Amino acid sequence: MLYIMRHGKTDWNACHKLQGRTDIPLNEEGRMMAAEAGEKYADIHFDECYSSPLARAKETAEIFLKGRGVPVYTDDRLVEMGFGIYEGIENSFAIKDCPINSLFKNPEDYVTVEGGESFEQLFARTGEFIDNVVMPQVNCGKDILIVGHGAMNCSIIAKFRGTPLDKFWDGMTDNCQVVKLI
């Protein structure tokens, strides 16, 4: 089986700043969320966990799986989508004509911002990870957990559900929510 989980809350989540690849750690609420999720989902078996190397995801995985003996591996293909020059911007939705907003409102019309990542790049790297790392293990009967980020997780969820780009954000999950994909 394959499960996916979004990291716990950070201070930047709380003030609506775009995090992207900026390495923001969990805050106390995020750590508590990860511990509570660990209790809530304690009956789900995992053989291995793959996490984004960014601190907020890796720490979520470690707290969530504490005491379960599940190895946590990081992989660069699981980092969050790059938001370029808009990382760290607070409340981008309030900025009139801010180009990053089309990413969230009309993803099919999104034009990659300076220093950012395109949907094609995101889907290529996460798809490669799923095809080359995860599926061979799932096909051998292993239960795998991926701990990542909003957009990165949505790309994997879209791959499994066949979601068109205009519905990309339909796969968005809450912080520390676990979703079974297969």
Residue ranges and their predicted role:
Residues 9-70:
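Active-site-proximal alpha-helix that buttresses catalytic centers in soluble enzyme cores
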Residues 161-182:
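Domain-level recognition of soluble alpha/beta enzyme cores
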Residues 2, 140-150:
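Generic beta-sheet signal
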Residues 67-125:
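Phosphate-handling substructures
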Residues 10, 152-153:
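Short active-site segment of divalent metal-dependent hydrolases/proteases
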Residues 42-45, 133-142:
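Glycine-rich phosphate-binding loop signature in dinucleotide/nucleotide-binding domains
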Residues 1-3, 48:
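Extreme N-terminal starter segment of soluble prokaryotic enzymes
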Residues 51-52, 124, 147-148:
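Short beta-strand scaffold positions
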